[in-house]
UniProtKB/Swiss-Prot annotation:
Bias-annotated ranges (Polar residues): 77-87
GO biological process, one term: translation reinitiation
Entry GO MF terms: mRNA binding; translation initiation factor activity
Entry similarity comment: Belongs to the DENR family.
Domain SUI1 as annotated: residue spans: 115-182
UniProt function note: May be involved in the translation of target mRNAs by scanning and recognition of the initiation codon. Involved in translation initiation; promotes recruitment of aminoacetyled initiator tRNA to P site of 40S ribosomes. Can promote release of deacylated tRNA and mRNA from recycled 40S subunits following ABCE1-mediated dissociation of post-termination ribosomal complexes into subunits.
Ranges for region Disordered: 76-110
Protein known as: Density-regulated protein
Source species: Xenopus laevis
Biased composition (Basic residues): 95-110
UniProt keyword terms in alphabetical order: Initiation factor, Protein biosynthesis
Keyword Metal-binding: no
Keyword Electron transport: no
Length: 198
């Protein structure tokens, strides 16, 4: 009798909704993880090395690979030529999909490794020393700025992309200090420009 009351009642009258979940698969679910990126295979397309993931999946699990690639086939027309299909793939590679990291690019060292030291006049008889080019030797500018401030007991700041300003005239001592602290910097790569106007 209780079951007939629930069946006849309005949905707004029921305080407890009886929802029966639909069972589409076996529980617990078995998730297939990629051997290249270690993510579930559905997420491989968002990684920067999609081609490697697809090759691994095609080699190890061809049936799963066929299911995943079926979603991409309807984009192409049935009467396409092979040359047209490859140009479409190239366009897809050029465009970065939202949410993906894209291809990781390596930095190219095109700038010559050279450190320049200059003495810049300020008001009256005061000077600042400008050191440029430490970043070309992969030296952290913030660490170098702290080191110069402690070594010379003065103020120092990182002002530009590759520039440190030290308050005071330290052009004579700074070459030896740089070579002492960072031995990868040789004497030929340090250039003293002398007194330069700002």
């Amino acid at each position: 009798m209780a079951s007939t009351a629930i069946e006849n009642a309005e949905p707004s009258d029921c305080k407890a909704d009886l929802k029966i979940p639909k069972i589409d698969g076996d529980f617990p679910l078995k998730v297939l993880y990629c051997g290249v990126c270690s993510l579930p295979t559905e997420y491989c397309e968002y990684m920067p090395d999609v081609a490697k993931c697809r090759q691994w999946l095609e080699k190890n699990f061809p049936d799963v690979f066929a299911k995943l690639t079926l979603g991409h086939i309807p984009k192409q027309e049935t009467g396409t030529v092979e040359g047209q299909a490859t140009s479409g793939e190239e366009e897809e590679k050029k465009k970065q999909k939202r949410g993906g990291r894209g291809q990781i690019k390596q930095k190219k060292k095109t700038v010559p490794q050279r450190i320049t030291i200059a003495k810049i006049p300020r008001a009256k008889k005061k000077y600042v020393t400008r050191v440029c080019g430490l970043a070309t030797f992969e030296i952290e500018l913030k660490d170098a700025q702290r080191f110069f401030a402690q070594k010379f007991s003065c103020g120092a700041s990182v002002t530009g992309e590759d520039e440190i300003i030290i308050q005071g005239d330290f052009t004579d001592d700074i070459i030896d200090v740089i070579q002492e602290k960072w031995p990868e910097v040789d004497d030929d790569s340090i250039e003293d420009l002398g007194e330069v106007k700002k």
